[in-house]
Each structure stands twice: as C-alpha cells, then as structure tokens.
Amino acid sequence: MIEAAMLWNEPNNKSHWDPVVDPDWSRFAHMASLAAQAVRAENPLLPRVLGGLSPIDPAFIRRLEGYGLLAHVDVLAVHGFPLDWNLWRIDEWPEKLAEIRAVSALPLWVTEVGVSSFGADEVQAWGVTRTAELLAGLAPRIHWYSLYDLPRTWEATTRHKEAEGSSYYRHFHMGLLREDGTPKLALERFARHTPELGICQWFHYEDPRLEQAVAWLKRLGVRHLRTGLSWADSFRPNALSWFDRQMEALADFDVTVTFCFTPEHLGLMPHHTSAPREPELFAQFCAQMVARYAPGRGVTATRPATEYAA
C-alpha cells in the first residue's frame, strides 16, 4: 500500500532541480504547495513528505518556511552519504538530524542513506552496520539507498567540484546488488537490520528488474519501500499500464511514492530538472496518481496527517 506521498526529490540538489531557472526556490515552493494541497484533497489521511534534502541544510528549510510551504506538508526528509560525498563524518548523523529538528517540529524521515562500494565492498558492509547503529530510533523511516547499482550507461549532473555531491561517480555503486543482480557483501549485513531499515529503489520506465527486485525485497524482510512515479514518464506510451504494474507488484510493502521530474516539453527549460511553466500541471499529476493508487476522497481526517507519519 502507499503510506506517504513525497513531493519531488532533493530540491536543493542541482541533479534534481535547476537553480539557474529558479535561483531563490520560489517557483519550487509554489509548485510543491499546489501539489501538497492537491494530494490533501484526494486523500486527507495520506502524509505529504517534502522531497528529501541533499545536502542537509536547515537554512533551506527556513527559506521554504518563509514561502509558506511547510504549512502544507506533514513530514520533512533528509538524504545523507557521508562516506562518499557529504562534508561531514558518518558519526555526525545524530547532529545532522538535530540541525533540522532545531528549525522545525515536523516529523523527520531519512529517505535516502547509503555508502558506496566504489572503494571496496568491505567499506560498504561496514557502512550498513554503522549507519543502522547511528540512526536506530532517531527517525520513523530510514531508507537505504539502494537495492541495485545504477546502470553505468546513465548520465549524471553534478555540482561544483568543491560542493557536496561532487563525487557523483560513487552514486552508481550504492546498491546492495550489482547492476547485473549479483549480491555484494553488504547485502547480508543489511538483512540483519530489517524491517527497521527500509529501501529506496527507483524503477525506470518498464524496468525489467521489477519482479526480481520484489523477490529480493521480500527475501530481505523489507517492509518500508520508497520509489517514484515520474511525471516525465507519464507522457510515454502505455505509461499508466507501467505505473499500474509497478504499484501492483509493490502492493505488499508500505510505499512512499515520490512524484517528480518535469516533462521536457513542459519545463521553462527542456530538462527534467527545470521548473515547469505551469506548476498546476504537476499538482494535477500528483492528484491523479493519489486518486488512482491511494484514493481517499470523501474521507474525513480525525487526526492530523503528521500523526500517521510518526
């Protein structure tokens, strides 16, 4: 089942939101506010999660609060990869969460955390164990990124070489499984920490790994899964059939579904990271997906959605 709707992914990361098009993030805040209200109208019980921050930046939260966005979301989220590209040590995880909690009382989830096997499989295996130790009890949801390595053929957009996120080549080696599906050393370590640790795994359009991934997730004892439904992909042929197949395959998990990626023909710039010309269209997409996969129109909320997110 879908347990939460996430609005965009890493909005303060150039790889997912173009700061040239929207240098003060006012367009993002407006778009996300519209989407949050649209989700609320379709299902008032479904928690709305602000796309996970990467890097973890309390000043960015204050900026969005200034635009009024935080009044329309129920959960904040952060992403961290301290052994690979963050400018802080892995042992600082509790402090990084405290920085966000110091500026907002909203529930806080860790919707991506990972360690790559780029340097050595043993480093990643140690990272799984240490991450579980550090984050245990500190967040209601902790999603390991990811089940599979990224396909090496994919392109990647990075930031300045001195900024967090610059070592993007490591991003392709975050999986517990290699691109060909063979297990890494970290897989067995991860299984020791489920269901407290969940998984974040994106499935690309008509991803042939879907059934195999579901089998692995069940074998590992995963309960909480984060994935995405791409607004850009919704314009591909037979997109709804693919979305239906994906959601049906994942029905046994508690799914946080992420809505993001601008269709090129709808962006201010022809790129999936661009702000859309008409943000209302993103809100419509979110509403349509919630109505299809997590319907709740007409339901009366007896508790704030934040309580369902705790």
Spans of features found by a protein language model:
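Aromatic-rich peripheral "rim/lid" segments of glycoside hydrolase catalytic domains that contact
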Residues: P23, A120-W126, L138-A139, H143-H204, ...
